[in-house]
């Protein structure tokens, strides 16, 4: 049974593509028809592709891999942040800083600087510094948190990227491809699907559509993690019983 239904996709407006004059011919195989100058995405193919992406997400999570959610357009910012946090992963939902992946060491230095400022605020250093200096530090903290807050606890390069609108996030796509990091992407009719390993043909402009698909990818990770928790919960009583029996013997 598919992980997402046609009804859910229709209700969220996933089938609405871009205007016919704004399209990438490589997306032709994912287009069902054209209506009033707008391409309509073939949702049967979307259902299948969501399944493939979902299963890949599960694989990554099963190997304790990390996934970086990326979506800096307004329609994606909230979903990307919320679903990454819900699934215990990482996110970039404002500007993608060039070198986030390809120059990870430098980015890590900026993150360390952010953590240093946070520590200064927490341990009371701000209270003994001149007001002007504190204002500047807070401004810097705010800026760094905005761009790097979603990855400040990411210890190394991610094992996969989930991207909303690869056309907008072309720098992130280029960096991931250079480092051979697999990409799952919500790909609209104006995007190049060849750059994405797991294409989800869908409307990337409607908030509901983005939310539905991003949440579904997060669900894949959560399912795996909850499964592990259940297994541990089931194993614990068995181990306790075995220990008791050994003691009695």
Swiss-Prot record:
Cysteines joined through disulfide linkages: none
SUPFAM superfamilies registered for this protein in UniProt: Ribosomal protein S2
GO terms assigned for molecular function: structural constituent of ribosome
InterPro entries in alphabetical order: Ribosomal_uS2 (IPR001865), Ribosomal_uS2_bac/mit/plastid (IPR005706), Ribosomal_uS2_CS (IPR018130), Ribosomal_uS2_flav_dom_sf (IPR023591)
Gene3D superfamilies: Glucose-6-phosphate isomerase like protein, domain 1, Helix hairpin bin
Keywords on record: Ribonucleoprotein, Ribosomal protein
GO cellular component term, pick one: cytosolic small ribosomal subunit
Pfam family, one: Ribosomal_S2
CDD domains in UniProt: RPS2 (cd01425)
Record GO biological process: translation
Family to which this protein belongs: Belongs to the universal ribosomal protein uS2 family.
Protein name, as recorded: Small ribosomal subunit protein uS2
Name of the coding gene: rpsB
């Amino acid at each position: 049974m598919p992980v997402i239904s046609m009804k859910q996709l229709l209700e969220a407006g996933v089938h609405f593509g871009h205007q016919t004059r704004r399209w990438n011919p490589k997306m032709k195989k994912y287009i069902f028809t054209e209506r009033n100058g707008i391409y309509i995405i073939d949702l049967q193919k979307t259902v299948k592709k969501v399944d493939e992406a979902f299963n890949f997400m599960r694989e990554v999570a099963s190997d304790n891999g990390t996934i970086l959610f990326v979506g800096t357009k307004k329609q994606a910012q909230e979903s990307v942040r919320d679903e990454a946090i819900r699934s215990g992963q990482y996110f970039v939902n404002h500007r993608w800083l060039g070198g986030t992946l390809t120059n990870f060491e430098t980015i890590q230095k900026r993150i360390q600087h952010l953590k240093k400022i946070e520590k200064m605020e927490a341990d009371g250093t701000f209270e003994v510094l001149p007001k002007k200096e504190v204002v500047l530090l807070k401004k810097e903290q705010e800026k760094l948190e905005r761009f790097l807050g979603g990855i400040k606890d990411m210890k190394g390069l991610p094992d996969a990227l989930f991207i909303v609108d690869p056309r907008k996030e072309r720098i992130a796509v280029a960096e991931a491809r250079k480092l051979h990091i697999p990409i799952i992407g919500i790909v609209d009719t104006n995007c190049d699907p060849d750059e994405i390993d797991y294409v989800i043909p869908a409307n990337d402009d409607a908030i509901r559509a983005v939310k539905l698909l991003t949440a579904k990818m997060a669900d894949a990770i959560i399912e795996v993690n909850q499964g592990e928790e259940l297994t541990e919960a089931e194993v614990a009583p068995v181990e306790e019983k075995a220990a008791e029996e050994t003691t009695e013997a």
